[in-house]
């Protein structure tokens, strides 16, 4: 009898453990509501009305665990159309929830709502969410934190505390008016008036000392800083005076840890760093600074945002402490940018393998850069000349979004003929010396063109920067996938030489990669996610000018390899 009871208890115990493991693995459903509403905000002594989520700027933090299902209801109370992109989420078979307007959905109109329903599969780390229509993401953005599954440790020392820090840009003017003026005149856009940490410009701007982000820390602790570059148009250097940072993650993918004093993030990128505080209380406070990296032509916001790292003390006041200020690289320090980027390597461990495709089915070569459109008749423009407007393109195709339906919807119902074409060029139609003397003709062609891929195609894509209207870096973001960065360099990509030096062992895995200024980058990915997926420069004005394209990934043969149908509350155009 005793033996039977013990056996029964043992079986029950093992069943409970198994059930808990399965439950932890399966995840839970988490519900959020985003109310899109107007809010008066004062920065730099100027009060203006901005579009927010739930009246917060930046917006609320979304937290989940790997394996969780997220159902986020977005209710639009403002006259602006809106859609939300969950930047970096794979959206496996849930492309209807990806968010870019007129790509995977029509925007949510005033008085309408839409539930973004997706499951976080095989991902953990720092991501973010933002509006994906016009320049609405200037104020509509926030962190998306994916914690590991229960009882799964980090592959680095457990931090005492985790702190998201979002980099942003503040415009005294309405960002929508800024981009509309630029597109109408053909000129570059007016620059922002400040950079921000978590919405605060800090003490280096006029009338801004009270709006300073402070990070309060204790001595002898390790903090995980979740850095997110949500700026519209600026790549940013970041540093903390007298403190070394250990990089442990990029774009929600763990990396081999390395130490640095300065972090560079392009728009759209995230980087997790460990900050180990000093062992005893220092008689000082420390500036955190961020300012742009830029090599292109035109006007940018070359100002510096400052926050304060302050040590807590139960008796001492910080009022009379000196503030130590760090230094940052010059604005055009491409050498630092390149060396920093090369430091990133995947863990490539048994727990977190680097599944880089070794065999490639399809190869593509995309020339990325600026260009021009002709000025409309009887109008004087302010582009490179008074007869041209600024534009941008991939393989000389400047992308035009549809406005009466979405690419995904037209594809799903089999009515894409009058919406997009499938003849996107796999390489430049007219090759040229991409990083040398630019061609005399800088005019781009315009169209809505995509590349079609069969399910599970392995893709190698070389992204080549160009010198047309100036060389500059381009942070390229791919929706729906992560990719491996197998190679990068300066000058023109050499197909006979450069692939021999690819890293196919531990290349970094990302969703957004900087094409070096005057250089190239090679990526590989597996097209295992059916749907329509945007790929674009995350410098917002370049996206507005057409530096984007889309991949259509066809369904596979099995039921779990097919795109699910759209939800019942899917927004209508």
Swiss-Prot record:
Glycans are attached at residues 40, 81, 117, 190, 206, 242, 283, 302, 320, 332, 339, 378, 386, 396, 403, 433, 440. It holds the Pfam family Cu-oxidase. GO terms for molecular function: copper ion binding; hydroquinone:oxygen oxidoreductase activity. GO terms for biological process: lignin catabolic process; primary root development; response to water deprivation. Cu cation 1 binds at residues 85, 477. GO terms for cellular component: apoplast. It catalyses: 4 hydroquinone + O2 = 4 benzosemiquinone + 2 H2O. Its cofactor is Cu cation. Cu cation 4 binds at residues 474, 537, 542. Gene3D superfamilies: Cupredoxins - blue copper proteins (2.60.40.420). PROSITE patterns: MULTICOPPER_OXIDASE1, MULTICOPPER_OXIDASE2. The keyword Nucleus does not apply. It comes from the Eukaryota. Binds 4 Cu cations per monomer. It is found in: Secreted, Extracellular space, Apoplast. Its EC number is 1.10.3.2. Ubiquitous and constitutive. Belongs to the multicopper oxidase family. This is Laccase-2. It comes from Arabidopsis thaliana.
């Amino acid at each position: 009898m005793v033996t039977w009871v013990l056996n029964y208890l043992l079986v029950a115990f093992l069943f409970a453990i198994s059930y808990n493991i399965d439950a932890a693995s399966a995840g839970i459903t988490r519900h959020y509501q985003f109310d899109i509403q107007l809010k008066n905000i004062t920065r730099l002594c100027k009060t203006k009305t901005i579009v927010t989520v739930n009246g917060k700027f930046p917006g609320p933090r979304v937290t989940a665990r790997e394996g969780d299902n997220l159902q986020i209801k977005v209710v639009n109370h403002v006259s602006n159309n809106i859609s939300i992109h969950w930047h970096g989420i794979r959206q496996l078979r849930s492309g209807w929830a990806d968010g870019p307007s007129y790509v995977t959905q029509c925007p949510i109109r005033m008085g309408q709502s839409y539930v973004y329903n997706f499951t976080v599969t095989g991902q953990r780390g720092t991501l973010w969410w933002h509006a994906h229509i016009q320049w609405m993401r200037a104020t509509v953005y926030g962190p998306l934190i994916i914690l590991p599954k229960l009882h799964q440790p980090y592959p680095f020392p457990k931090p005492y505390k985790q702190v998201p820090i979002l980099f942003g840009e503040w415009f005294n003017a309405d960002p929508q008016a800024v981009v509309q003026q630029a597109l109408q005149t053909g000129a570059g856009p007016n620059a922002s008036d400040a950079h921000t940490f978590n919405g605060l410009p800090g003490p280096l701007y006029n009338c801004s000392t009270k709006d300073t982000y402070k990070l309060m820390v204790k001595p002898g602790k390790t903090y995980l800083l979740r850095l997110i570059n949500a700026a519209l148009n600026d790549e940013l250097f970041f540093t903390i005076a007298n403190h070394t940072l250990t990089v442990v993650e990029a774009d929600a993918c763990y990396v081999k840890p390395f130490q640095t004093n300065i972090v560079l993030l392009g728009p759209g990128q995230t980087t997790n760093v460990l900050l180990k505080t000093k062992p005893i209380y220092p008689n000082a406070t420390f500036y955190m600074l961020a300012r742009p990296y830029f090599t292109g032509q035109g006007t940018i916001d070359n100002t510096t945002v400052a926050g304060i790292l302050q040590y807590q003390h139960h008796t001492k006041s910080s009022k009379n402490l000196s503030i130590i200020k760090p230094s940052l690289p010059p604005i055009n320090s491409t050498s630092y940018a390149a060396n920093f980027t090369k430091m990133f390597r995947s863990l490539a461990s048994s727990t977190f393998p680097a599944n880089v495709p070794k065999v490639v089915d399809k190869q593509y070569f995309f020339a990325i850069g600026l260009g021009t459109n002709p000025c409309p008749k009887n109008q004087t423009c302010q582009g490179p000349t008074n007869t041209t407007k600024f534009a941008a393109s991939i393989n000389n195709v400047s992308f035009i979004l549809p406005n009466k339906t979405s690419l995904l919807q037209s594809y799903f119902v089999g009515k894409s003929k009058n919406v997009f074409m499938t003849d996107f060029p796999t390489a430049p139609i007219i090759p040229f010396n991409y990083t040398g003397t630019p061609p005399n003709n800088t005019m781009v062609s315009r169209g809505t063109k995509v590349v079609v891929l069969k399910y599970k195609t392995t893709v190698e894509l070389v992204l080549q920067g160009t010198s047309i209207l100036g060389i500059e870096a381009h942070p390229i973001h791919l929706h729906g996938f992560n990719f491996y960065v197998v190679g990068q360099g300066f000058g023109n990509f050499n197909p006979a030489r450069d692939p021999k030096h690819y890293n196919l062992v531990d290349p970094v895995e990302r969703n957004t990669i900087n094409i070096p200024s005057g250089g190239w980058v090679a990526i590989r990915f597996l097209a295992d996610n059916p749907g329509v997926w945007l790929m674009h420069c995350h410098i917002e004005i370049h996206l507005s000018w057409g530096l984007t394209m889309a991949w259509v990934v066809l369904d596979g043969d099995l039921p779990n390899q097919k795109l699910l149908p759209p939800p019942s509350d899917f927004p209508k155009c």
